[in-house]
Curated annotation (Swiss-Prot):
This is 3-oxo-tetronate kinase. It comes from Pseudomonas savastanoi pv. phaseolicola (strain 1448A / Race 6) (Pseudomonas syringae pv. phaseolicola (strain 1448A / Race 6)). Its EC number is 2.7.1.217. InterPro entries: 4-carb_acid_sugar_kinase_N, 4-carb_acid_sugar_kinase_N_sf, NBD_C, NBD_C_sf, OtnK. Belongs to the four-carbon acid sugar kinase family. ATP binds at S268, G366, G367, E368, T369, G410. One of its GO terms (molecular function) is kinase activity.
Length: 429
């Protein structure tokens, strides 16, 4: 990773690790040299970071809103000290949150700290089937509340009306930037934003059905100090900086290949990850399932997994992925937070043990799982490389012992993602 004291243009705060990589991937595709930090960088790491965009990955999506606000404001302060011209708060394209927060509370705090009176909220990601119309979020052809997300173990999404969902999380007035305004182009969006501001609206859910809509929104909001949303909303941001003559034309995705062993670790219970695990099993590739009840009983699950990986003689999948019914049964017995925390901790310990055994390439499925794994591996900075599947790039860590990682949000990736990611990480991804 080259270093030269360049001033970053865009500062990003992501509420989980895979969301951060998703956003960083989008920015790299737009030509911005992007570095992802696991938490707020230390002074040593920060010295001379050479990047057009810096994405700080927090683990705040499901933390109490007061904690999420404090962490996000600390990240904001760090980014502003580096001279970032615009701030982007990234959350999931399925708006993962509850009435307790914390998308609204964090957005509210960032707005106030930036002394701004308005921001957009747009989690749309059409390339992955997430679209918004009349304020309602769709996943493919289904409303969010009927897409399987209503069964999410930590943030069950039972309402697709994002205006209503966001309003429950903030004291500020929430409005809607409807599609008919977006269809009028950049000036139409700017005019509608002016009207919303005059009505006392501080946050507006923005409709978006296509990438073209996201480019329109991005251009229209070039002067807003804060934007919030999914990675899709960042599509148009590199173009704004390029138009202003602030962005160089280079290959932002260039990376080196990393040699060593490889593994797939999956903790997500999402529909997509369940399909990816099934595809691996159908190919008769070696896999070991971790049972949270065994962890709770004190069985040597981590040691068994490390032995399994060592003796397999080929790349293995170690997974805790389960169906929604199985997840609910475990949660009923162990509790929601305890069951998830135990799985994350175990997969983190397994990753650390595999690192000590020579594994250097890690494919990880699930936002919470990815957070646990990168922390266990001691990863602090990631250089973002080429895209594997929409929203998921290959990455390489900095430091004396570089690692190649693919950190996948639970619901992202094609059915053959695991095999595809391993292949890309093994090359000059």
């Amino acid at each position: 990773m080259s270093l030269n004291n360049a001033r970053p243009l865009l500062g990003c705060i992501a509420d989980d690790f895979t969301g951060a990589t998703d956003l960083a991937n989008m920015l790299v595709r737009g030509g911005m040299r992007t570095v992802q930090s696991i938490g707020i960088p230390s002074a040593e790491m920060a010295a001379g970071l050479d990047a057009d965009a810096i994405v700080i990955a927090l683990k705040s999506r499901t933390t109490p809103s007061a904690d999420a606000v404090a962490e996000s404001l600390a990240a904001l302060e760090w980014l502003r000290e580096r001279g970032c011209e615009q701030i982007f708060f990234k959350y999931c394209s399925t708006f993962d949150s509850t009435a307790a927060g914390n998308i609204g509370q964090v957005s509210e705090a960032l707005l106030e700290q930036l002394d701004s009176d308005f921001t957009l909220a747009c989690p749309a990601f059409p390339e992955n089937g997430r679209t918004i119309f009349r304020g309602h979020l769709f996943v493919q052809d289904q409303l969010l509340s009927e897409s399987g997300m209503q069964n999410h173990p930590l943030t069950p999404m039972t309402d697709a009306n994002l205006v209503r969902v966001l309003q429950a999380q903030t004291r500020h007035k929430v409005g809607l930037l409807r599609y008919d305004s977006i269809a009028q182009g950049v000036e139409g969006v700017r005019n509608r934003i002016a009207e919303l501001r005059a009505e006392g609206v501080s946050m507006a859910i923005a409709d978006a059905l296509s990438d073209a809509d996201l480019y329109t929104l991005g251009e229209a909001c070039a002067d807003l100090p804060l934007l919030t949303g999914g990675s899709g909303l960042a599509l148009g941001l590199p173009g704004n900086f390029r138009k202003a003559g602030k962005l160089r034309d280079i290959d932002a995705a260039k990376q080196v290949a990393i040699s060593g062993g490889e593994v797939v670790l999956a903790g997500s219970a999402s529909v997509a990850t369940n399909g990816q695990v099934a595809a691996w099993l159908e190919d008769n590739r070696p896999a070991l399932r971790i049972n949270p009840l065994d962890l709770a009983a004190g069985k040597p699950v981590v040691e068994q997994a490390l032995t399994f990986a060592r003796d397999a003689g080929q790349t293995v999948l170690i997974y805790a992925t389960s169906t929604p019914d199985e997840v609910k049964a475990v949660q009923k017995e162990l509790g929601v937070e305890r069951s998830g925390a135990m799985v994350e901790a175990a997969l983190g310990e397994i990753a650390k043990g595999l690192l000590n055994a020579g594994v250097r390439r890690f494919v990880v499925a699930g936002g919470e799982t990815s957070g646990a794994v990168v922390q266990a591996l001691g990863v602090q900075l990631l250089q973002i490389g080429a895209q594997i599947d929409p929203g998921v790039p290959a990455t390489v860590s900095s430091g004396a012992q570089p690692l190649a990682l693919a950190l996948k949000s639970g619901n992202f990736g094609a059915r053959d993602f695991f095999a595809k990611a391993l292949k890309q990480l093994a090359g000059a991804a």
